[in-house]
Each structure stands twice: as C-alpha cells, then as structure tokens.
From Swiss-Prot:
Signal peptide, first to last residue: none
InterPro entries on file: GlpE_sulfurtransferase, Rhodanese-like_dom, Rhodanese-like_dom_sf, Thiosulf_sulfurTrfase
Primary gene name: glpE
Protein's name in the database: Thiosulfate sulfurtransferase GlpE
Active-site residues per Swiss-Prot or TrEMBL entry: C65 (cysteine persulfide intermediate)
Organism listed in the record: Erwinia tasmaniensis (strain DSM 17950 / CFBP 7177 / CIP 109463 / NCPPB 4357 / Et1/99)
Pfam families in the record: Rhodanese (PF00581)
Length: 107
C-alpha cells in the first residue's frame, strides 16, 4: 500500500475483528484520558518511537483523531515508517463514540 485509505467506523470495526489491526488515537493526552475507543493506543510524539520499535509492521494500523482530518496525515506518515497498510477513520472519535458508546473507555 503506497497511500493510506479512508474508512468509516464500521469498516474499522471489521478490520479490528478480521485483520488483527492496531488502533491508535492521536488526540491530545487529556482528551484520550477522558475517553477513547476501547483497546486504542495513545500515539503521541513521545510514544511514537517505542510504538514503532515494538509494533508488528505487517499488521494494518487504524488512525483515529477528533473528526477524521488529522488522522490522514498520521496514517500516511505511518505508512512511510514501514506499516504494510494504514487507514484514517472518517468521523474520528466523535463518530465512534456516537456509534459504539459501549466500546468507549476512560483512563
């Protein structure tokens, strides 16, 4: 995959279930701590190096932000770092929270 793809939240759910995808949330730490998709990893400038070092780059990575805009650049960046596939989740956490309130956690 040379270019990331945009997917909706239902497609993201499917990839998490079927493809053993990684889910990362790039929102700020305070927003992530208040609420995030269950199982999401908080990806920040600080957590990026260990994340890249410890992740299986063959697994697809799904990127979530607030509304689905910032995640596009992050998904493309992760592709450039060696991930085999990267996806930006349209609607971001806000769409996820509305559609899947039972799959939202807080720290």
């Amino acid at each position: 995959m040379e270019q990331f793809e945009c997917i909706n939240i239902q497609q993201a759910q499917q990839k998490l279930a079927d493809d053993n995808a990684l889910l990362v949330d790039i929102r700020d730490a305070q927003s992530f701590a208040a609420a995030h998709a269950s199982g999401a990893f908080h990806l920040s400038n600080e957590s990026l190096p260990p994340f890249l070092a410890q992740s299986d780059l063959a697994r697809p990575v799904l990127v979530m932000c607030y509304h689905g805009n910032s995640s596009k650049g992050a998904a493309q960046y992760l592709l450039g770092q060696g991930f085999s596939a990267a996806y930006s989740i349209d609607g971001g956490f806000e769409a996820w929270r509305i559609a899947f309130p039972q799959q939202v956690s807080a720290q």
